[in-house]
């Protein structure tokens, strides 16, 4: 794919013509293809298959799909769906990805709109307009909040480095994809990296330190880091080096050794910044599988060696679930075993991109455990960054107050 054809716009909603198209993230980074979403069922399939992913984006696509579904029903000669029919469809949509709370929150909000009507009542323009206004506001708020998250994360990074009296270049590790492709735009964890690089890269930083390099984890087994985060970093021209998930400890150890380097880079890792699909009342955070081990690695280096690495979780307030007390109560989605036993991608011949094929990489017929998420205990999290102006940090007793 030529660089001119690339885009970071994951969601296209035409407010005038009421159409929804999403960027098919299963074919990135080799192809830019948009898929038309014309119904709630289309959205369910796209979310379930991970053609769209990222907790905020899932909620936005779900909400817009509901709008499109109602609109098409009202315009159809045979359109006579009831409130009860819509409520049944909403519960079906909710089952597409159970771990991320944003979709559940959006569906609950829409359910509240429907509570004013009888279940037997036929869908009408008033219901449509209320849900249309809700969905567009959800998108607009998410985009504005992502920029706030970026600025708040930048502020926290600057304050942390100043408190430590750190000077010189530093690096950041991230996992999965938490950028424009996972949200309405800019991103959460990757949004912080964007904002930080814009203000703190070597040529513009007015501080005694600067962001030198980013290390995105490959993010097995679905490889969102390799496919999507590298796509965004390359698009934004932010310097990065891709690593496997199991290289993190070695990377940190190498970069803290003044006599060693990684392809000429020596800037130490000072921050690990991740997103979240659900943050519960006590601060436990569910995120892409592999996040928990990053926090554990950071804790080891912080406690066993003379290293200070801040572990930051970045997410909008819509990701915070105050109705769930601890991470033990979070339902963790388990993905199909084939995602672990096969690799899917196009055949590459030089610069030519061929047909997509599936390649086996494991012994046939074996048992596989493939949880999509893990839960990082709040005790391992240094800060939770949201659109709220002040970063959430633990009190003297090691507890978060997210209310």
Curated annotation (Swiss-Prot):
Functional description taken from the UniProt entry: Catalyzes the interconversion of methylthioribose-1-phosphate (MTR-1-P) into methylthioribulose-1-phosphate (MTRu-1-P).
InterPro entries for the chain: IF-2B-related, IF-M1Pi, IF_2B-like_C, Initiation_fac_2B_a/b/d, M1Pi_N, NagB/RpiA_transferase-like
Gene3D superfamilies with a match to the protein in the record: translation initiation factor eif-2b, domain 1 (1.20.120.420), Translation initiation factor eif-2b, domain 2 (3.40.50.10470)
Protein name: Methylthioribose-1-phosphate isomerase
Record family assignment: Belongs to the eIF-2B alpha/beta/delta subunits family. MtnA subfamily.
Signal peptide positions (record): none
Annotated positions for site Transition state stabilizer: 176
Pathway given in the UniProt record: Amino-acid biosynthesis; L-methionine biosynthesis via salvage pathway; L-methionine from S-methyl-5-thio-alpha-D-ribose 1-phosphate: step 1/6
Residues the record marks as active site: 277 (proton donor)
Keywords for this protein: Amino-acid biosynthesis, Cytoplasm, Isomerase, Methionine biosynthesis, Nucleus
Gene Ontology molecular-function annotations: S-methyl-5-thioribose-1-phosphate isomerase activity
UniProt GO BP: L-methionine salvage from methylthioadenosine
Catalytic reactions on record: 5-(methylsulfanyl)-alpha-D-ribose 1-phosphate = 5-(methylsulfanyl)-D-ribulose 1-phosphate
Subcellular location: Cytoplasm; Nucleus
The protein's enzyme class: isomerase
EC number of this enzyme: 5.3.1.23
SUPFAM superfamilies recorded: NagB/RpiA/CoA transferase-like
Any single GO CC term annotated in Swiss-Prot or TrEMBL for this entry: nucleus
């Amino acid at each position: 794919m030529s660089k001119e054809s690339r885009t970071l716009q994951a969601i296209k909603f035409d407010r005038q013509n009421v159409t929804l198209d999403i960027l098919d993230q299963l074919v990135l980074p080799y192809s830019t293809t948009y898929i038309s979403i014309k119904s709630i069922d289309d959205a369910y399939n796209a979310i379930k298959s991970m053609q769209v992913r990222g907790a905020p984006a899932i909620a936005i696509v779900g909400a817009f799909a509901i709008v499109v579904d109602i609109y098409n029903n009202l315009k159809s000669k045979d359109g006579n769906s009831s409130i009860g029919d819509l409520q049944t469809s909403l519960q079906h949509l909710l089952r597409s990805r159970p771990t991320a709370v944003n979709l559940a929150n959006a569906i609950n909000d829409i359910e509240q709109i429907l509570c004013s009507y009888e279940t037997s009542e036929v869908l009408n323009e008033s219901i449509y307009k209320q849900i249309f206004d809700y969905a567009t506001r959800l998108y607009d708020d998410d985009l504005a909040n992502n920029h706030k998250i970026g600025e708040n994360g930048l502020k926290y990074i600057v304050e942390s480095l100043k408190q430590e009296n750190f000077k010189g270049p530093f690096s950041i590790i991230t996992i999965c994809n938490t950028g424009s492709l996972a949200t309405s735009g800019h991103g959460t964890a990757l949004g912080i990296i964007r904002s930080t690089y814009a203000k703190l890269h070597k040529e513009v930083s007015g501080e005694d330190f600067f962001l030198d390099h980013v290390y995105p984890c490959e993010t097995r087994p679905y490889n969102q880091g390799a496919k999507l985060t590298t796509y965004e970093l390359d698009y934004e021209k932010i310097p990065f080096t891709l690593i496997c998930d199991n290289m993190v400890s070695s990377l940190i150890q190498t970069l803290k050794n003044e006599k060693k380097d990684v392809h000429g880079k020596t800037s130490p890792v000072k921050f690990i910044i991740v997103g979240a699909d659900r943050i519960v009342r006590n601060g436990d955070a569910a995120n892409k599988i592999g996040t928990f081990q990053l926090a554990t690695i950071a804790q080891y280096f912080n406690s066993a060696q003379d290293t200070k690495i801040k572990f930051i979780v970045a997410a909008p307030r819509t990701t915070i679930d105050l109705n769930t007390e601890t991470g033990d109560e979070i339902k963790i989605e388990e993905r199909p075993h084939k995602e672990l036993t096969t690799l899917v991608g196009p055949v590459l011949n030089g610069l030519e991109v061929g047909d997509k094929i599936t390649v086996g990489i494991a012994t046939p017929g074996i048992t596989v455990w493939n949880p999509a998420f893990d839960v990082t205990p709040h005790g391992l999290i240094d800060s939770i960054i949201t659109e709220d102006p002040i970063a959430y940090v633990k009190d003297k007793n090691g507890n978060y107050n997210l209310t």
